[in-house]
């Protein structure tokens, strides 16, 4: 078990544990696991009588035929007992007050995870403040061959993240922690791992896949002013990934991020990640589009709303990814547009709402700053910084004449966050690279499953009570890619 303390006032803290350096030029950034087969659990926890699990395997022949190179990931927000309400009339009564309840529920969670036997398990809302529960997870997971990494949220929030790596599948090269030290005391784990079994890149060469596992849990959007905080959290993760790749001279690698993103496919975080070349693995497996937000759910929140918020994001190798800062600015402008839409302000009226007298008028930098306050992006403790505001102004003043006019507003209003295609293509293993092409190993999504099964149909079963989140498992297979 790792115990950590927050000893810095920096907005983002990076801590690392270095394990032997890696040498292969072909690396992967992924949140993965080797699952023997997708599994549905039926009749699970329908009442208080703690009936044993009834298990139904899907495609049982898959287990024996699956090649060793297949990998998969399980991500699951297990609902910390300190947050689980047990009395709807008295919200101050939590499961953490009743040992028999939280002990039994978490044992059923462990039964599910150990039966799946994913090579990487990423958990959120682990009750790290309770030694008995922590020991329970560490003992059972380590006894089953997992190495465990744990990270508490800052400011003694009581819960945190846990990532378990199966020793039969991955060797840990490097482990780092990100402490955002922001409004929500959120954190992230990054693990650089390498496959134990080499992957045949071609007929002459075997390589060990190198992988980065990212596990995180973003802030819940209690109100629209927190949109910028959530965007900051994702930006910090992507910014650090870029720095890590540069520091270790890593090129052409897939990246997978997983966790509870506390936002749906309609949100700014989703669009931001899509603009950086990421795909939702679950949607890719089921051939859903970005507009298919209603097809599946993974969470019923404390307000009783059901939505899809748990993702395993995949970004395959590419040299043509849009600059991160460009995507960031586009995402902030998207928030401004959303806030105006939410206030029922159309494009024709937006300019006057922001402070202009009419369409022939223009806004100075001071006017622009006041406009940002109106849409909850500045003037609040967790809003845009001075430097970010200046950068936004430079991007808004397209012609560089020192003022912001209506024509520039229209261009921003009509701007869309385009999903960024890559310049690497999947190739058959026997194919030879052309001049100017580089070889890389990418990932192909084979299968993605939500448990409980009803969540895949956009429904939430009333008898499901091991968490307020669904468990998501995605299976990948490595593919050769040629990057031009």
Curated annotation (Swiss-Prot):
Q: Which residues bind Ca(2+)?
A: 397, 399, 401, 408
Q: Which SUPFAM superfamilies match?
A: DNase I-like, EF-hand
Q: Does the keyword Electron transport apply?
A: no
Q: Which InterPro entries does the protein's record reference?
A: CCR4/nocturin_mRNA_transcr (IPR050410), EF-hand-dom_pair (IPR011992), EF_hand_dom (IPR002048), Endo/exonu/phosph_ase_sf (IPR036691), Endo/exonuclease/phosphatase (IPR005135)
Keyword annotations of the record: Calcium, Membrane, Metal-binding, Transmembrane, Transmembrane helix
Subcellular localization is given as: Membrane
Predominant location category: membrane
- Name of the featured protein: Uncharacterized calcium-binding protein At1g02270
Species per Swiss-Prot/TrEMBL record: Arabidopsis thaliana
